[in-house]
Amino acid sequence: MTSLLTTPSPREELMTTPILQPTEALSPEDGASTALIAVVITVVFLTLLSVVILIFFYLYKNKGSYVTYEPTEGEPSAIVQMESDLAKGSEKEEYFI
């Protein structure tokens, strides 16, 4: 009964926190599984990073590549065709509903 009444020494009180308590060494199996998990996480991270970099370079390289169907400025046939289309547009058109 005397052990219940005695107060622990200050050194023993400090050891009650989980950080300061002595830890057991990892077994070789636990160390190997920890290393395997670290390798898998690293490979996944590097794969995602490389995919993001490839997408960035692809989008940067193909920026602004589109085709317009507008006639060029110097084509006289296109200008004449546009003028004839404008002349047709001035006529009154009827729409039946």
UniProtKB/Swiss-Prot annotation:
Keywords from UniProt, A to Z, are: Cell membrane, Cytoplasmic vesicle, Glycoprotein, Membrane, Sialic acid, Transmembrane, Transmembrane helix
Q: Which InterPro entries match?
A: SMAGP (IPR043243)
Q: In what way is this protein post-translationally modified?
A: O-glycosylated. The O-glycan is modified with sialic acid residues.
On whether Transferase is a keyword of this UniProt record, the answer is no
Query: How does the entry describe its membrane topology?
Result: Single-pass type III membrane protein
The listed locations are: Cell membrane; Cytoplasmic vesicle membrane
Topology, Extracellular side: 1-36
Which positions, given as ranges, span the membrane? 37-57
Kindly indicate whether the keyword Acyltransferase belongs to this entry: no
Its tissue distribution reads:
Detected in breast, endometrium, colon and biliary tract. Detected in polarized epithelial structures characterized by cell-cell adhesion (at protein level).
Identify the main location. Answer: membrane
Q: Which PANTHER family match?
A: SMALL CELL ADHESION GLYCOPROTEIN
Q: What is this protein called?
A: Small cell adhesion glycoprotein
